[in-house]
UniProtKB/Swiss-Prot annotation:
Single GO molecular function: transmembrane transporter activity
Assigned protein family: Belongs to the major facilitator superfamily. YcaD (TC 2.A.1.26) family.
Residues passing through the membrane, by range: 14-34, 45-65, 75-95, 102-122, 131-151, 157-177, 204-224, 235-255, 265-284, 289-311, 325-345, 349-369
Main location: membrane
HAMAP family linked to this entry: MFS_YcaD
Annotated compartments: Cell inner membrane
Protein name: Uncharacterized MFS-type transporter YcaD
GO CC annotation, single: plasma membrane
The keyword Cell membrane is annotated on this UniProt entry: yes
Keywords recorded for this protein, A-Z: Cell inner membrane, Cell membrane, Membrane, Transmembrane, Transmembrane helix, Transport
Membrane topology: Multi-pass membrane protein
Organism: Salmonella arizonae (strain ATCC BAA-731 / CDC346-86 / RSK2980)
Amino acid sequence: MSTYTRPVKLLLCGLLLLTLAIAVLNTLVPLWLAQASLPTWQVGMVSSSYFTGNLVGTLFTGYLIKRIGFNRSYYLASLIFAAGCVGLGVMVGFWSWMSWRFIAGIGCAMIWVVVESALMCSGTSHNRGRLLAAYMMVYYVGTFLGQLLVSKVSGELLHVLPWVTGMILAGILPLLFTRIVNQQTEARYSTSISAMLKLRQARLGVNGCIISGIVLGSLYGLMPLYLKHQGMANASIGFWMAVLVSAGILGQWPVGRLADKFGRLLVLRVQVFVVILGSIVMLTQAAMAPALFILGAAGFTLYPVAMAWACEKVEHHQLVAMNQALLLSYTVGSLLGPSFTAMLMQNYSDNLLFLMIASVSFIYLLMLLRNAGQTPNPVAHI
């Protein structure tokens, strides 16, 4: 059977449109708030409300999928996200926008849980790496194109909201032409997120998602600041960030293919070692271009491989709950990592960005090496 079935292709098409909308709003909302003369701390609170919504949406989407299935959960998630977008045009103000961004955060998290869970339930141990690699490629391409859109179109609030809302609603259309089977409704057992987080044999995957959140959150959030402090102009910063993200896009398919062929454990070890190597090279400031490229290629592909590892350790009816646990772990890492790293950079040195990334990656590498006796690709429950 083909890895990229018709439902998978249509699901990824819808995700591309939704990711474009997410990228545009995540870039423009802080700018709109600044134009409205809101203080910096309020801009930060609005951003935090979005991520809080992500956490809330992650927690209950599994129950929703079990009750109404993948398709209806996807439709509902998209409509919630669209409502959060439309609400921004109702009233510009701190409390109003904090509420609407919270709602948008819930919708976005629901979309991610539905898409990731559907892909994992559609795959097997032999092709999940490629499925998740395709998912991440679509996500990063959508993010890149969203940034491109921001630079090419009018950034006025009332000009942007109509076409972004239309794009969100258009993201629903592909799934109207297919049905994603939810086999979890046939399961007799109920699985909780906490049970998945405590599952000993999947701990490497959970820890990998936390580390991935720390690494990517720090690179996304703090790399532009690091480059700015090196005296670079905005155009140069944009170029180097494009190198980083492009490397992440290019690395997805080959890494996913290698993980399917040679096993997740071996590939995870190599990835983490390469992240450490890239961080050390960045500390020496010897060769920024290759260092950033290998950081992007290894760091941006860590999440899907760690996710595939964890999913091989559970029964088929536990996949949605496991995906919730992994996405929750990633979100926590992406929230805590940049916050702690930013404090270190402010109080000591900007180089602590890469020292922090190398340190947490080294800890994870030790965890991976301790599991040398385990089979790299455990038998999956199909």
